[in-house]
């Protein structure tokens, strides 16, 4: 037992000694100067900045869209690579393609940059001619367009504007077109040698006419769409004549209306000694001239309206024109009776005006009331003459009563 206890105590002592020895031998870092501490801190900050930049670059590369790579690769590939035909096309004859049928659409349009610029008028004429040709020649195929070039200078200039700017592969009748949209070219394309030689042999002997497509296109546009002609002066003269003929009877009627209104005003002013107004027949103010067997509706309505305005009575003589009731030939009978009554009334009115014109008229309220009553009397008498469709308009009466400023009614 004693031996075991001694051994345990010995082991504990040895362990404690080892721990103390390690603590004494551990290196202690002491910075004697402050500059060394600041430099150490700056180094740590620089390392942290570098790590942050590297982390940011890693995130940018992870979320990249590939735009930078595409931009860097533009110098290696052609910008018009998407327009090139997939299959290699064999070189055909000179008239079966503009440049052998081996160029793309974009390059073929750029190859014409050496042409001289044209004026705006020529461009407008070419566009008009091309639109007219497209509307008339949509059903034509490309084979007919190219085969018709050898027919003559007229057909050559016509077919020159219908060229299709697409790559074609001609093997007998088989064709493989990569694009299904046909582009109608409205530019000046260089004509082949065969066409230019045939076009130069025109009857006039000038080769420039066969080579200049704008002139031929402009001429064709004029043929397809002729210029508008100015309207002849005969139409204006005829319209003026018709207006004069139409308004001539109305002017005559207006002149007659003025004369009759003056006569009616003079007749109303004349009053006898007893203070009673003279009795005028209703038909004395009505005047019908040039009665036709079947008068037109427009002239009849105008005469009736003029008669209603000519009469001094303030109620309507005849109804307004209505589209429901057509013109009846039986109205001539009533017009004839009005004409007879008008002649009799004028004669009696003239005789009375000559005999009594000395006394001034009265303008009192009683005189106006008696005048209105006397105006209503012939209204009742004449209502028996007209047919039933005219009665509703005859029952209306309008009397004008002037109000004096001294007394209020």
Curated annotation (Swiss-Prot):
- Cellular component annotations (GO), alphabetically ordered: cytosol; nucleoplasm
Compositional bias segments (type: Polar residues): 134-160
Q: Which residue intervals make up region (Disordered)?
A: 12-32, 133-160, 194-213
What this protein is called in its record is: Uncharacterized protein C16orf46 homolog
Origin species: Mus musculus
Source species taxonomy: Eukaryota, Metazoa, Chordata, Craniata, Vertebrata
């Amino acid at each position: 037992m004693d031996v075991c206890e001694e051994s345990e105590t010995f082991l504990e002592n040895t362990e404690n000694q080892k721990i103390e020895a390690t603590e004494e031998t551990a290196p202690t870092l002491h910075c004697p100067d402050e500059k060394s501490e600041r430099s150490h801190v700056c180094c740590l900050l620089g390392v942290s900045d570098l790590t942050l930049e590297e982390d940011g670059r890693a995130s940018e590369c992870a979320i990249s869209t590939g735009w930078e790579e595409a931009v860097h690769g533009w110098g290696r590939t052609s910008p018009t690579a998407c327009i090139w035909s997939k299959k290699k096309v064999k070189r055909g004859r000179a008239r079966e393609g503009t440049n052998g049928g081996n160029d793309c659409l974009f390059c073929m349009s750029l190859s014409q940059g050496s042409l001289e610029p044209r004026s705006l008028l020529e461009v407008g004429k070419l566009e008009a001619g091309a639109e007219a040709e497209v509307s008339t020649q949509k059903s034509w195929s490309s084979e007919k367009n190219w085969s018709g070039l050898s027919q003559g200078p007229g057909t050559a200039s016509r077919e020159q504007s219908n060229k299709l700017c697409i790559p074609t592969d001609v093997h007998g009748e088989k064709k493989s077109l990569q694009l299904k949209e046909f582009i109608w070219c409205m530019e000046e394309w260089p004509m082949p040698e065969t066409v230019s030689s045939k076009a130069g042999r025109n009857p006039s002997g000038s080769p420039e006419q066969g080579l200049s497509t704008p002139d031929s296109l402009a001429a064709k546009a004029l043929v397809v769409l002729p210029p508008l002609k100015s309207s002849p002066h005969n139409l204006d003269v005829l319209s003026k004549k018709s207006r004069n003929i139409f308004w001539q009877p109305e002017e005559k009627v207006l002149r007659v209306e003025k004369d009759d209104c003056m006569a009616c005003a003079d007749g109303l002013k004349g009053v006898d000694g007893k203070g009673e107004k003279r009795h005028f027949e209703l038909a004395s103010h009505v005047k019908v001239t040039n009665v036709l067997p079947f008068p037109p509706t427009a002239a009849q309505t105008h005469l009736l309206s003029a008669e209603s305005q000519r009469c001094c009575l303030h109620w309507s003589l005849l109804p307004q024109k209505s589209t429901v009731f057509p013109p009846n030939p039986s109205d001539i009978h009533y017009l004839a009776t009005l004409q007879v009554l008008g002649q009799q009334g004028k004669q009696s009115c003239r005789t009375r005006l000559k005999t009594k014109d000395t006394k001034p008229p009265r303008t009192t309220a009683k005189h106006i009331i008696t005048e209105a009553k006397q105006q209503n009397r012939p209204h009742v008498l004449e209502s028996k003459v007209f047919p039933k469709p005219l009665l509703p308009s005859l029952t209306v009466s309008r009397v004008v009563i002037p109000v004096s400023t001294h007394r209020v009614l």
